Amino acid sequence: IMECAFQLVEDYGCENLIRIGTCGSSDPNIHVGDTILSTASAAESNNTVPVFGEYDFVPTSNFELLKAAYDCAHENGIAVHVGTSGCGDVLYKEPDQPESYRNPWKGYPMIAAEMEGTGLLVATARYPHVRGLLLITCSDHQLYSNEDTPLAQRETAYNNMMKVALETAYKMDKEAQ
């Protein structure tokens, strides 16, 4: 996703990039279908090395964009969780692997795990005029694996996420004019 983000900025002049999609969680306060705004994205591996060399970098969502999304969600009666997410390299890890491999953030306050966030936020951090945000919906939960979410409820959850993203983009574009 990092290369795609660079292309959107360099070739198309995009200034607000919002990653929408699904994530997993092991936070007991989050359930399948909940909407999450990620404040920062910690990488599981060294995928920031091509950009930062030997230095670690944990990119953050742009506060203005995050606040606009938070406000849009609340204006529409959509509850959101706000916190740090982890960006993994592998979606489904083998159960016979050590716990430290299957859940590298256990014991840390990561409210979500997904696979694209760090790349997007690293790319947007490169440009002073570009803002990035991770807006994700919990689709899988390690603690509540028995939560069976009906199709209509999943559609509502994903629609809520998209509504927040589109209204946030509209609001940011309107303010820029």
Where are these regions (language model features)?
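Generic structural signal for well-ordered, non-membrane alpha-helical segments
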Residues: 1, 58, 62-66, 78, ...
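General beta-strand structural signal in soluble alpha/beta enzymes
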Residues: 16-20, 37, 80-86, 111-115, ...
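Short acidic, glycine/serine/threonine-rich loops at helix termini
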Residues: 28-32, 48-49, 96-97, 125, ...
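Active-site rim beta-loop-alpha module in soluble metabolic enzymes
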Residues: 56-109
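Generic non-transmembrane alpha-helical segments
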Residues: 68-76, 123, 164-175
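Zn-dependent metallopeptidase/amidohydrolase metal-coordination segment
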Residues: 118-153
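His/Asp/Glu-rich mid-to-C-terminal helical/loop segments that flank catalytic regions of hydrolases
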Residues: 142-177
